[in-house]
Structures are given as C-alpha cells and as structure tokens.
From Swiss-Prot:
This is Cytoplasmic tRNA 2-thiolation protein 1. Its EC number is 2.7.7.-. GO terms for biological process: protein urmylation; tRNA thio-modification; tRNA wobble position uridine thiolation; tRNA wobble uridine modification. The keyword Protease does not apply. It comes from Saccharomyces cerevisiae (strain YJM789). It comes from the Eukaryota. It holds the Pfam family ATP_bind_3. It is found in: Cytoplasm; Mitochondrion. One of its GO terms (molecular function) is tRNA binding. Its main location: cytoplasm. Interacts with NCS2 and URM1. May act by forming a heterodimer with NCS2. Component of a large molecular weight complex of more than 250 kDa. InterPro entries: CTU1-like_ATP-bd, CTU1_C, Ncs6/Tuc1/Ctu1, Rossmann-like_a/b/a_fold, TilS/TtcA_N, tRNA_thiolation_TtcA_Ctu1, UPF0021_CS. The lineage of its organism: Eukaryota, Fungi, Dikarya, Ascomycota, Saccharomycotina. Keywords: Cytoplasm, Mitochondrion, RNA-binding, Transferase, tRNA processing, tRNA-binding.
C-alpha cells in the first residue's frame, strides 16, 4: 500500500541540510534511521510508515475476518500496549470490522504483575475496549511466586510460559473468542529461532517463525501482527504517540535462557542491523526432512488434536505439559511439607533420612 507524507501547516520547517531531511517528505528534519533499511525519517513520516507496514502485514497474511472477535494478549508492556492501540487505530481507519477485547493473565508476581495490570486497566479506559483478566491462582491454584518458592527461580520461565499460553487459550475459550493476537515482535521471533538452534530443538524450527499458529482440533488460533516490526521501532512509536505502558522487567526474567539469545542478538545487530529480519527469513525457509517410518515400533504417538487425559486440554501427549508440571509441583510441595514437619520425633526424622540413602 502506498502512502503520502503528512503535511504540517502549523509548524513550518526550518531550513536544514539536505542530508538531514526526511527521505519521504523532504521537508522536516530526519529524527530516526531505521535499522531494517537505514532510511532516515521524521517523526510524522515514521509513525505513518510504521502504521502502514502493520496494516500491510495484516492484509497480506489475511489475519482478520470481518465480524471476528479478537482478543489482544494484554500485559501492559510496550508490545501489547502498542498492539492494542494499533489494532484500535487500524480497525477504525481501514474498517476491518473486528471486535477487539483485551485479555490479561495475572500470573501472581507481587510487585510486577499487579503493577502492570494497573496499566492495562488504564489502557482499557484510554482505548474504550472491554477487559477480561484470568489468574494462575484461579486456573491452577498456584501463583508464580508460589511456584518459584517450590521449584526455584531458574525454572520460572518454563512454568510461566506453559501456564501462560494455556491460560490465554482457556480465557479466550471462556469468552467465546477463537482468535488471540500477541505482541511478539521481530526481535522475539529471531531470538526464538536462535534458541531453537542452540538447544537443538529442530522440531520447532520450521514453525517458530509462523505468523499464524493453530493446533489441529483447536478452536483458538494465534497471530503476530508485529512479526516484522523491530522492538526499537515499537518503543519509538510508543514514545512518539505518548502511549501509557509498563516498562519494568519481570522479576524472574534475568534467569531466562532467552536473555542469552537476546544479548547475542544485540551483538549481531551492532555489526549487521538487518540481522533480525535476516534470521527470520532464514527461519521461514527451514524445513525438516521427512523421517522414515519404523513399522516395528509400537509406541503410540499423540498428535495435535488429542486431549489431555486429566484436564481435557489439547495435547500432543497423553498428559499435557501443564498437568505434568502441576504434578511435579504438588510432589515438591508435599516433600517440603514433610521436611518442615516439626511435630515428628527424632527417630522418625532419622528414618526418613535413611530412606533417602542408596547403597
């Protein structure tokens, strides 16, 4: 889609060197050099170009259907806040004909999520959009703070990632919504490709850059309108538009493996600014060679579309990942309770200690 540089009749531009002028309007001073193509743009042209690119991504990938009810995974952070603002803006401008709902998950992280949810509630008022909040405590009877106290901080992102993804699906299903959009940006996508390579997780490489994902048999699909949008530009857009967002990092994030991939990405980007898009495009072209089937194997393989035997959630295994994690948590909590039982006498404590020994 083509666009025309916005005019500014009120603030007439002062004379500046040609090399400092915006490459689009040729009248205002350039304030940004875009990392993906190194073009120099002024504030007004950058915002218009950024909005137009998101619209083009939505149209090119046919993300929305008229009359569709769409849930924005809202955390209060920069990505989801800009996403909510952008979808509201573009829906009004281009008449997508979609109904937008803010869907938030309260993981139960005191001093972080409670503050970010306050931002989401302000966004609800600012954008005039309905808001629904679901909590880990209600869905799983655990908060993230409780999980960390039992499982340790190094495992926090594993639990949070699994429970959060499932919570978004469960929340959307309860609201009768079949489409969830998330604020995953180009940096996130490139980091995911790198993480899968570093972990040797080839099974996920092929689908790690998909803009739309949906398990077979699932009524919920997910899409990422910011797939080609750099994080730097999302932050800059939020700054220029004076959007209200929460910028504090999660309490447990520093221990995440993603942080290692992020630091590596920053080093690469300093040498080659286009590396983020380059990695995404490489990921898009990755395909796994089909494996030969072994007729003698009698292992029953579960594919997407099967249901967890415990909770009924979609799972590629007999027991879903969330239920497996919950089982481990309950066992750990029981063990902690036994070890903290001060009512037991000395002999009983010694017996328990002996039972742990192997000979």
């Amino acid at each position: 889609m083509s666009f025309t540089a916005p005019s500014d009749p009120v603030n007439k531009p002062t004379k500046v060197k040609v090399s400092q002028l915006c490459e689009l309007c040729h009248s205002r001073k350039a304030l940004i050099r875009r990392p993906k193509n190194l073009s120099k743009l002024c504030k007004q042209c950058f915002c218009l170009v950024f909005e137009t690119e998101i619209h083009n991504t939505i149209v090119a990938n046919n993300l929305f259907q008229r009359g569709e009810k769409v849930a924005v995974g809202a955390s209060g952070g920069k990505d989801s806040t800009v996403l909510a603002h952008m979808l509201k803006l573009l829906n009004d401008r281009y008449d997508y004909g979609i109904e937008i709902v803010l869907l938030s998950i309260d993981e139960g992280i005191i001093g972080y999520r409670d503050d970010s949810l306050a931002t989401v509630k302000r966004n609800q008022q600012q954008y005039g959009l309905p808001l629904e909040i679901f909590s880990f405590k209600d869905l799983y009877d655990w908060t993230m703070d409780e999980i960390v106290s039992v499982a340790g901080i190094r495992n926090s992102c594993t639990y949070c990632g699994v429970f959060r993804r499932q919570s978004l699906d469960r929340g959307a299903a309860k609201l009768g919504i079949s489409h969830v959009v998330t604020g995953h940006n180009a940096d996130d996508m490139a980091e995911t490709v790198l993480m899968n390579i570093l972990r040797g997780d080839v099974a996920r490489l092929e689908k790690s850059t998909a803009i739309i994902t949906q398990s077979s048999g699932s009524p919920i699909k997910r899409s990422k309108p910011f797939k080609y949008s750099y994080q730097k530009e999302i932050v800059l857009y939020a700054h220029y538009m004076k959007l209200d967002y929460f910028s504090t990092e999660c309490t447990y994030a520093p221990e995440a493996f993603r942080g290692t991939a992020r630091e590596y990405m920053k080093n690469l980007e300093a040498v080659r600014p286009s590396c983020i898009i380059d990695i995404i495009q490489s990921g898009e072209n990755l395909a796994l060679k089909a494996k030969k089937s072994n007729a003698r194997k009698r292992v029953v393989k579960f594919v997407d579309g099967n249901r967890c035997a415990r909770c009924g959630y979609l799972s590629s295994n007999n027991i879903c990942k969330a239920c497996m994690l919950l089982e481990g948590l309950e066992k750990s909590r029981a063990q902690v309770a036994i070890e903290n039982d001060t009512s037991a006498d000395g002999a009983a404590l010694k017996l328990r200690a002996l039972e742990k020994l192997s000979f």
